[in-house]
């Protein structure tokens, strides 16, 4: 099995609910290690750049507005099959469709305020990790 790194963001809704520790506990219980982490309040420019892939989608403006509405917790998760593991922990994008016990089923309010973001593929993960953690501030554990 390959050790991977993936980007995870705990979104403003979940940060406001004070569930960062509960979400981190789920990552660690699944065998994922936090290799880098920081809290940030994204600027509009950062959010627009990060979600540029969605620029032409009808939800783009609402997504950017939501992501700049409060602080987020950004982390790099590391472990065997980290990308898939994180996506399984998160659950479906729409919390109404998310399996019981997933992060979104337990902490998200809507498809927009859905608690977490996670990279969807190895290539995406590499780009997303570099966006928020350029340079050498990620630590193998």
From Swiss-Prot:
Its main location: cytoplasm. Signal peptide: none annotated. Its cofactor is Mg(2+). It is an enzyme of class 2 (transferase). ATP binds at residues 11, 59, 87, 93, 104, 114. GO terms for biological process: CTP biosynthetic process; GTP biosynthetic process; UTP biosynthetic process. The keyword Transcription does not apply. InterPro entries: NDK-like_dom, NDK-like_dom_sf, Nucleoside_diP_kinase. Keywords: ATP-binding, Cytoplasm, Kinase, Magnesium, Metal-binding, Nucleotide metabolism, Nucleotide-binding, Phosphoprotein, Transferase. PROSITE patterns: NDPK_LIKE. GO terms for cellular component: cytoplasm. It comes from the Bacteria. The active site is at residue 117. It catalyses: a 2'-deoxyribonucleoside 5'-diphosphate + ATP = a 2'-deoxyribonucleoside 5'-triphosphate + ADP; a ribonucleoside 5'-diphosphate + ATP = a ribonucleoside 5'-triphosphate + ADP. It is found in: Cytoplasm. It holds the Pfam family NDK. PANTHER family: NUCLEOSIDE DIPHOSPHATE KINASE (PTHR46161), NUCLEOSIDE DIPHOSPHATE KINASE DDB_G0292928-RELATED (PTHR46161:SF3). Homotetramer. Belongs to the NDK family. Major role in the synthesis of nucleoside triphosphates other than ATP. The ATP gamma phosphate is transferred to the NDP beta phosphate via a ping-pong mechanism, using a phosphorylated active-site intermediate. This is Nucleoside diphosphate kinase. It comes from Paracidovorax citrulli (strain AAC00-1).
């Amino acid at each position: 099995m390959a050790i991977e790194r993936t980007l995870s963001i705990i979104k403003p809704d979940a940060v406001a609910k004070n569930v960062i520790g509960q979400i981190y506990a789920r990552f660690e219980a699944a065998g994922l290690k936090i290799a880098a982490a920081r809290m940030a309040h994204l600027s509009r420019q950062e959010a627009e750049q990060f979600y540029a892939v969605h620029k032409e989608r009808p939800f783009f403006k609402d997504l950017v507005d939501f992501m700049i509405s409060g602080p987020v917790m950004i982390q790099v998760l590391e472990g065997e099959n980290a990308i898939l593991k994180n996506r399984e922990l998160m659950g479906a994008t729409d919390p109404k469709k998310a399996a019981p016990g997933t992060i979104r089923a337990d902490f998200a309010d809507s498809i927009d305020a859905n608690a977490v973001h996670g990279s969807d593929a190895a290539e995406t993960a590499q780009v997303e990790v570099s966006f928020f953690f350029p340079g050498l501030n990620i630590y193998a554990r």
